[in-house]
Amino acid sequence: MRATQPRGVVAAACLMTLLAVGQPTSAVDDVTLVDAARNQESPRVRALLDQNANANVRSADGSTALLWAAHWNDIAIADSLIRAHADPNIANDFGMTPLSRACTNGSAALVELLLKAGANPNARIATGETPIMTCASSGNVDAMRLLIARGADVNANEPSQNQDALMWAASERHPNVVRMLVEAGANPRAHTKKGFTALHFAAREGDIESVRQLLAAGVDINIKSLPDKAETKQDTNPSASGGRSASGTAAAAAAPRGPGYQATISEGSTPLLVATMRGHVPLALFLLEQGADPNVIDAGLTPLHWASGTWEGGVANPVYGFSEPMSGIPNRQQKIALVTSLLAHGANPNARMTKRPPGFQGLGGGYEDAPGATPFLLACAADDVEMMRLLVTAGADPTLVTETKTTAVMAASGLNRLIGESPITEAQALAAVTFLIELGADAKGATTIGENALFGAAYRGWNTLLELLIEKGADVNAVSKANITPWLAASGYGDRLGGVLYNKEGAEILLRHGADPKLGKPCQAQVRCK
C-alpha cells in the first residue's frame, strides 16, 4: 500500500464510530431516523419521513441518516432522504461525508445521486482526502467520470504526505483510472513529501499497465524519488558512470568493467530500483526494454545488487513507500532472467555498494559487511554458484573486496553473516568456495578486524570446509581485534551469538593443524569482548 494510509485509517475509524452511535440527544422520532438508516430499515425510514422527521438530524457523533445510507450503499434510503431535503454535505464529527463514503464503496449510482443533490465534489474529510482521491483508490471509472464532470480537482492532495488521486489509483493497480486522470489533467510528475510519484507507486505494485499509461504521459522512466527540498547528488563523469547518462541512453555495455567502473551516483530510487527491490521481475524486464538505467544507485545498491543477492529482512524507511518484509525474488527462473537482462542492458557487475540499506537484517541470510560489496560478493555470501558463474561470465572481478577487506572466499565461508537459522548448507558453501578457488581466489588474508575465512566455518561447524580452507593456506592462528582465534570460535568462546556453542570436531581439526590454544582471550558472546 502507500507509504502512509490516511484513507484506510480514517475509513476504519469512521466505521467504528458509526457502529458505536451514542444515545439520542434530540427528539425521539428524529434520532430514530438515524437508527433506522443505520439498521437499513427502508420502510421505517420512509414512515418517519412521512411523519416529518428531520432528515438532517445528527446522532451523538454527528452522523446523519444519509451518511449511514451511503455507508451501506443503500440507494433507496438515500433517495428517500434526499427527497426529504437531506443535506449531502453534512459531515460527522470526524469529517466524513456521504460522498466520501459512496466513493469508498465505489458506488457510481450513489455518487451521481449525491452530486445531483448538491454534494461538493471537492469536500475534504478530516485527513484532507477528497472524493476523487477516494474514488481513484476504489477504482470505479464511472464514479470518477461523474466527479470530474462536476469539477473535482484531479490534482488535489492530502496534506500528510502530499499523495494525490493519481498516486492512489496507481497504488491500487487501476490503470483505467490512471488513464482517465491523466487525460483530465492530473500531473503525472507530482510527488509525495518523500519523493514518490505515481510511477513509483505503480512500480511498487508491479502494475505494468499503469506504468505504460504514465510513461505514455511523458514521465521520465528514470525519474527519482527525491524528497522535498532534497538536491540530487549525481556524478556526471562518464568514466564514473560507465558512459551511461541519468536518462539511460548511453551504451554502457561496452564500458570498462574494472574496479573503477562505478554506478550512477544519485539520491532517490527509480522505478526500476523499486520494481527490483519488490521482486516484480516482469515489470523490471519491461522497464529495461524501455530504456531504464540499470546502473543507478540508491540506498547504497544498484538493481543488480538487489537481483543478485538473497534478501531476508524488511525495509522500514518511508522513502521506499512501504514497510513490509521483503524476501527478494523467490522464483529462481525469474531471478536468473532479471540478472541476465540487467547485464545485457549494461549493468555493471563490479559496482560497489556504498552503504547498508536501512532496516535490513540480511544480505544473503544476514550478511553484515555491505559497504564495498559487489553483486558477485553478494552472490558469494548466498553461496549461489549459478549466480556467481553468471556474473563472472559477464565480467565480475572475483578479487574485489569490501571496505573491511572481506574477500569472496570469506563471504562464501559464512564470515560476516548473521549466525543462526539459515537455509544455506555446508555443501552449498563448499561448492561456492571450490568454485572460487578454481577461479584462482586466495583463501588467505584477513579483514580489517583480523578475522579470516576460518572464523565463519568454525562458528557454523562446517568442518569439511574448515579443512579445505586450512589446506589452501588460511591462518589457523589468526587473532581478531576482539582477541578471538578460529580455535576459540570453534570451542564456544567466540564473540558471535547463535554460532555452534561447542564445535568439538572443528576445534580438534584446528589443533591438528597447529592452532595455538593459548592465543587470544576466551569470550562469551553475551558479554562484550575486550
Task: Label each region the model flagged.
Residues S59, N92, I125, E158-S160, ...:
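Ankyrin repeat boundary/linker residues
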Residues A11-A20:
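Bacterial N-terminal signal peptides
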Residues S26-W68:
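N-terminal segments that cap or nucleate solenoid repeat domains
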Residues Y502-R512, D516-K530:
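Terminal, low-structured helical/coil segments at or just beyond the last alpha-helical repeat
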Residues D29, G62, G95, G128, ...:
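Start-of-repeat signature of ankyrin repeats
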Residues D35-N39, W68-D74, R101-S107, T134-N140, ...:
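Ankyrin repeat A-helix N-terminal signature
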Residues S42-L49, D74-I82, S107-L115, N140-I148, ...:
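Ankyrin repeat structural motif
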